[in-house]
Curated annotation (Swiss-Prot):
Protein name in the entry: Bifunctional protein FolD 2
Keywords from the named record: Amino-acid biosynthesis, Histidine biosynthesis, Hydrolase, Methionine biosynthesis, Multifunctional enzyme, NADP, One-carbon metabolism, Oxidoreductase, Plasmid, Purine biosynthesis
Entry function: Catalyzes the oxidation of 5,10-methylenetetrahydrofolate to 5,10-methenyltetrahydrofolate and then the hydrolysis of 5,10-methenyltetrahydrofolate to 10-formyltetrahydrofolate.
GO terms of biological process kind: L-histidine biosynthetic process; methionine biosynthetic process; purine nucleotide biosynthetic process; tetrahydrofolate interconversion
Gene3D superfamilies: Leucine Dehydrogenase, chain A, domain 1, NAD(P)-binding Rossmann-like Domain
Organism: Rhizobium etli (strain ATCC 51251 / DSM 11541 / JCM 21823 / NBRC 15573 / CFN 42)
HAMAP family: THF_DHG_CYH
Record keyword Amino-acid biosynthesis present: yes
């Protein structure tokens, strides 16, 4: 019988740890964890996402600051705000909501955030720390960090002897996910759109992570019996059964058929998704502990 991972439940337990750690830090050192979120322009999806991040930060007991800037904000103005937040000791995490409206260039903005405040884990310094196995001072990108919580809950801390395949090589997810698996001693293969015999490569995986943005691409015959399958894809597909023009969310894995083969699987929605915001909160409270010279909590 397959185990379907309840992402909402595990995210809630992460948030519980964040709340306890936030309160303990305040009690021991008088430091209130601070998160600043910057949003530029009026994209409704971005505003909804930022709203949920800010609400969650307040729920965790953080000082939560939201900077809403007009679409015509210049590169210099945005860079200036980041510099101000970098210099503010009451802010431990800085998040710039992407994508930025054109013609703003997000890359120099992201790289200008102090690595110790880069709670999205997107700076080249944090990417480099992960690549060299430094998980003590770096911050890890939230979605792979969340997916890794699932892997550890199923397989433990040490993945020695297990084969892991990550489909997707993005800087945002695929590469950091592979590094995390490698740091835990898994034997890791990164597959992608140019990989030959992709199904065959996937069939060797004890842990299969799909992050390519192709609806239900991973079929049952790609999966080793009993494997752990982590589905990071979020795809909208037509759902005529719901009515004309309606859509539904599916992952990169054909959930129903793969559930017959896998040992453990994450659903879409309700799997990796809820973990992303939870791990953002985790990174922020970790950053606050480090800034205060305290030992950060483990997730």
């Amino acid at each position: 019988m397959v185990e379907v991972i309840d992402g909402k439940l595990i995210a809630a337990s992460v948030i519980q740890t964040v709340k306890s750690a936030t309160a303990a830090l305040e009690m021991v050192s008088g430091v209130t964890t601070g998160l600043a979120v910057i949003i530029v322009g009026d994209d409704p999806a971005s505003h909804a996402y930022v709203g949920s991040k800010s609400r969650m930060a307040k729920e965790c007991g953080f000082k939560s600051v939201q900077h809403t800037l007009p679409a015509e904000t210049t590169q210099e103005e945005l860079a200036g705000l980041v510099a101000t937040l970098n210099a503010d000791p009451s802010i431990h995490g800085i998040l710039v909501q992407l994508p930025l409206p054109k013609p703003l260039d997000s890359e120099p903005i992201i790289q200008s955030i102090l690595p110790e405040k880069d709670v999205d884990g997107l700076s080249v310094v944090n990417a480099g720390k992960l690549a060299t196995g430094d998980l003590k001072t770096g911050l890890v990108s939230c979605t792979p960090a969340g997916a890794m919580v699932f892997v550890r809950r199923t397989h433990g801390e040490d993945l020695s002897g297990l084969n892991a395949v990550v489909i997707g090589r993005s800087n945002l997810f695929g590469k950091p996910m592979a590094q995390l698996l490698l740091n835990a001693n898994a034997t890791v293969t990164i597959a992608h759109s140019r990989t030959k015999n992709l199904a065959e490569v996937c069939r060797n995986a004890d842990i299969l992570v799909a992050a390519v943005g192709r609806p239900e691409m991973v079929k049952a015959d790609w999966v080793k019996p009993g494997a752990t399958v982590i589905d990071v894809g979020i795809n909208r597909v037509p759902a005529p059964e719901k009515g004309e023009g309606k859509t539904r969310l599916v992952g990169d894995v054909a959930f129903r058929e793969v559930s017959e083969i896998a040992g453990t699987i994450t659903p879409v929605p309700g799997g990796v998704g809820p973990m992303t915001i939870a791990m953002l909160m985790a990174n922020t409270v970790i950053a606050a502990h480090r800034a205060a010279g305290q030992v950060p909590p483990k997730f």
